């Protein structure tokens, strides 16, 4: 993909649309095995060179302050696979590895980051009467490093996990999914994340879903808040940033409408509510020359509704 035509329709001397050169290569292999057991491997490579900024910018200005520009080189490769063990029970080993490298500048502020993620899990899928049970164990390796003040040393952690899920089919119209996941993070201790999902299908054209659960997320500040890298404001981190934690619930209604001429319309409506016990929200208002980050004082909520027609 290539887009290299700078546009400035509002005449502010800044590009209106990000310019980019991108290449992506993907390949998947499926292996034929006895008893139709699954074994597949897929690989992908991605490279992108994107920039935006003043209309006069070109790569010779990269990293300087003579002409402002934001330039990002991204190189990423990943491999993933799924292997069904040659045993009577249905047990799969799933694995993946990704390597992500970002070389970027925001004016004369460099942001250099590397992330490597390795993942493997064993999943046992067992059907018993009206129950479809998934039982599994996983391990995740994460390496992250960048050149910002928020990362004094490379962040390297291995997180083991256990999880169980039971989907109960009461009738053809109703089912209930119960799940629990346990992770151990050496930085944050024991992490439990339960979830519940109810599905009701009163007709072939109507589906109602109700989901609830908890959330836990470690924030990588500068990968998510690029405004902190532009150099326009000083970045202030007032305390050690804790993980974001939340409780959430959402309801979804899906309606299919068939017309006599053969056309199909799908109406999708969702509403959600999230209660955060901690969230990392940038403060742009206290000081116009600073972006201040700290842990949430109290709680925060997020509510919303969406409607889509397809």
Residue positions per predicted region:
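Sequence/structural signature of outer-membrane beta-barrel proteins
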Residues: 2-10, 48-52, 98-107, 141-148, ...
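Membrane-embedded beta-barrel scaffold of Gram-negative outer-membrane proteins
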Residues: 1, 90-104, 201, 209, ...
